[in-house]
Amino acid sequence: MGPVDTSQRLARLRELMQERKVDVYIVPSEDSHQSEYIAPCDGRREFISGFTGSAGCAIVSMSKAALSTDGRYFNQAAKQLDNNWMLLKRGFENMPTWQEWTAEQAEGGKVVGVDPSLITASEARSLSETIEKSGGSLQGVQENLIDLVWGKKRPARPSEKVALHPIEFAGKSFEEKISDLRKELQKKKSAGFVISMLDEIAWLFNLRGNDIPYNPVFFAYAIITPTTADLYIDDEKLPAEVKKYLGDQVSVKPYGSIFEDAKALSQSAQKKSDGDASTSPSEKFLISTKASWSLSLALGGEKNVEEVRSPITDAKAIKNEAELEGMRACHIRDGAALTEYFAWLENELVNKKTVLNEVDGSDKLEQIRSKHKHFVGLSFDTISSTGPNAAVIHYKAERDTCSIIDPKAVYLCDSGAQYLDGTTDTTRTLHFGEPTEMERKAYTLVLKGLISIDTAVFPKGTTGFALDAFARQHLWKEGLDYLHGTGHGVGSYLNVHEGPIGLGTRVQYAEVAITPGNVISDEPGFYEDGVFGIRIENIIIAKEVKTTHGFGEKPWLGFEHVTMTPLCQKLINPSLLTDGEKKWVNDYHSKVWEKTSSYFENDELTRNWLKRETQPI
C-alpha cells in the first residue's frame, strides 16, 4: 500500500492543538488497554500517518511530523509515509528516540499533549521527565484529538458477543484462577487488582470474544479483591449462558463505569489512610505496569497504587497440561493444512503454470485451514510474500497492489490460526525453481539458528535475552543479522503475541526467566532489502530435561517443538550442516510424516509432496 495524503488531516489536527494550547501531540499505536493488535476504531496512529504496521508512535508539532517504528517495519514505513512525515528508525545510531525528538520539539516551554488512556503511568512519568529537561511539559488531553479529526468516518466500537471457553481446553476453572490470584494479592498485602489487559481478562474468566481482529478478546475491565470479583463489560455482550456461568460469584457492571468506581476506591483508600503521609501496602491497589495513565490517575496515582508485572500475565504464560495438549494437537492439524497448501501451490505454479498473486495464495490457505477441527479464524494477517516482498518483515499483501507469485523466486509464508484448543504461528520459506547459492546459504544459516534454539539446554533462571544469541551466532559469523526478535510468547486460543517471555534483546526478556510450560516461537531470519527474505518459524514448549551432571542441583530446561510442517529441502545446503544438525532435520521430518501423513490417505498430490519433502538429507 502506497502513501496516503495526510495534509488535510494534519492541518485539522494542528487547528485542534492550537485551540487547546498544545504545541506537540503524541499519537501512540495502542488502545486504552495497551493492546498490540487493536480494533479498527482505535487505529488512530494509522489514520493520522498512513502507516499500517502494528508498532510505532506518531508525533506531530505545529511544523513537523515524525513516525517512530522498529526494524520490522522500516521498509514498510518508508513506502507508506508521505512527504509530511520523517521516519525515526528505532535503535539506529545517531537517530533520536521518539521521546528525545518530542523533547526537542518542546524546547522553550512548549506543551506536549497525549491522551492519558493510551500510555502507561510509567511511560507518562518517564516522558514527563525527558520533556521537562528541555523546558517543556507533558499534559494529559482527555478528549482524543485524532477522534475529532476522524469524525463520523471513525469505525464504531465493536460489541460482539462473548463466548465460554470450555474447561476441556482451558484446563482450569475461573474460580480456581481467581482463588490463585487472591493468594498473590494476599502475599502482596494488597486491597485488590485492577485488570485492564484484554487477554488477561479473557484468560481469567475463561471467556473469549471477537472485538479485535485475530485476537479472541473483548472490551472489558475487572477488579478482583479478597472478597469480590467485578467484571466491567457492556451488558449486551453477555449471552444468557455466560451470565448464568458467572453466577453470583462475579458482579457484572457497565464497561464505562470503571473510572467512576476506581475513583470511589481511591477515595475510600484515602479515608482509610486517616491523614497518614502514605497509604499502607494493605490499602493499595495493584495495577499492571501496562495499565493506562488515566486508570492510575483515577485510582489516586502512586499514593494508592502499586504498579507490578501482572501476576495474571505470569500465570497465563505457564500453560497447564490441557493447554499444552491442545497446542500439540492444533499444530498437527495446522501443519497438515500448510502441507496441503504448499503442495497445491507448487502444483499450480510449476505444473499448471497458473498465474496466482500473493492474496490468491493467502486466501487458499485460509480456505484449507477452515476445514480443520476447532478452527475459529486466523491469528494474524497472513504474510504471503514473493521475491523482494519477502524482505519486508511484516509485509501485508493487498489484492489491488500485490505481486504475482514468482516460481523462480523465494516465497515466504508466515501464517497462523486460532483453534479452540490453541493458537498457531508458523513461517516457511520455499523455492519452486532453482535458488541461488546465496539464498541456500542464508536459508541454511537461519535453519542452523533455529536448531540451536530448539536443541538448547540451559539452567533454570535463564532468560530469553540470554538465549537470543544462540539463534544469531551462525549469521554473525558471516557478518549477517536480522532486525527483529527471535521469538515471542504464544497464547492458548488467545493472542499470538503474548508476554512476558520471549527470545530477544527487549528489556522485558531479560527480566523473566524461561519456565516449563512456556510456549514460544523460534523464528530467526535474514533479509536482503529489495532481493529476498528468509524466515523459518517453529513453536516450541519449554520443559525440564535430564542432563549428565545437573550442576548446581537445580532443574535444567530444554524445548519440545510442536510445529509439524516440512522444511524446504531445495533451500538446504547440507554441506553447511554438522552431522548433528543433519540428524535433527531428518528426525524432524520423520516426525512430521508420522504425525500428518494420515491426513492425506485420499490426497495423492499432497501425500507425494510430503513424502518428497520429508526424505532424509
Curated annotation (Swiss-Prot):
Amino acids binding Mn(2+) 1: D425, E523, E537
EC number: 3.4.11.9
Top-level taxonomic group: Eukaryota
Cofactor needs: Mn(2+)
Keyword match Metal-binding: yes
Pfam families assigned: Creatinase_N, Creatinase_N_2, Peptidase_M24, Peptidase_M24_C
InterPro entries on file: Creatin/AminoP/Spt16_N, Creatinase/aminopeptidase-like, Creatinase_N, Pept_M24, Pept_M24B, Peptidase_M24_C, Peptidase_M24B_aminopep-P_CS, X-Pro_aminopeptidase_P
GO molecular function, one term: metal ion binding
CDD domains hit by this protein: APP (cd01085)
Keywords annotated in UniProt: Aminopeptidase, Hydrolase, Manganese, Metal-binding, Metalloprotease, Protease
GO cellular component, as recorded: cytoplasm
Cofactor annotation remark: Binds 2 manganese ions per subunit.
Binding site for Mn(2+) 2: D414, D425, E537
Biological-process GO terms, alphabetical: proteolysis
Protein purpose: Catalyzes the removal of a penultimate prolyl residue from the N-termini of peptides.
PANTHER family according to UniProt: XAA-PRO AMINOPEPTIDASE 1
UniProt-recorded name of the protein: Probable Xaa-Pro aminopeptidase P
Species assigned in the record: Blastomyces gilchristii (strain SLH14081) (Blastomyces dermatitidis)
Gene name per UniProt: AMPP
